């Protein structure tokens, strides 16, 4: 058998093909393919950082929080007027250079026999109220539609003389000795609150804001943990101011 070999002097055309020139669109697509995860992470970090800065620097934090607890919300005009009227009685407790009073509404019906209660709003109201009454809650002053139901269910109030029941879960606390009627308090009834237009966003009923608040009772949070007393010192001063000259008629 004979072997066929190539002449060692034979030459080949080894000129390589010129490299391909990618378009800008192809280059961008290639870069995105390998770096999209890093871009997403960077964007999330920036967004989170902006949110933190906004929350810590620009968010308005109330110096005083007042809670209204009733079966229906207060008119928006009433809430705004009350916040504005209480502001001159308060000071900058959180040191942010502003004095802000915030009235929070909790829609709760303590009458278990009421079949007209909206279960969704009831659950939402109870959940929010329970959270606020926890050890981290800031609310000290309460405007109550049903003080008996509130105290029976929460055991959160203190007596008007500043004492608290030995056991916050006691069932025999006399709520009548824990609250004033709004109309018992000369300072509160003397507030210039103006009027409201519409009990809700869906009607055009008008009236005075004092008439909306006249049927409410005013109570304050009981503090059993001495470590929490400094938390409510500023609010306690506000309570003393608002109830100055008041004589309770809750037992009548």
Regions found by a protein language model. Give the residues of each.
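Acidic, glycine-anchored loop motifs typical of Ca2+
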Residues: 92-119
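Short, polar/charged alpha-helical segment
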Residues: 76-98
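N-terminal intrinsically disordered, acidic low-complexity segments at the extreme N-terminus
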Residues: 1-19
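Cytosolic juxtamembrane amphipathic/interface segments immediately preceding
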Residues: 21-30
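Bilobed periplasmic-binding protein/Venus flytrap-like ligand-binding cleft at the lobe interface
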Residues: 187-252
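Extracytoplasmic "Venus flytrap"/periplasmic binding protein-like
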Residues: 118-191
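Hydrophobic membrane-insertion alpha-helices, especially the h-region
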Residues: 35-56
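Short, well-ordered beta-strand elements
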Residues: 63-72
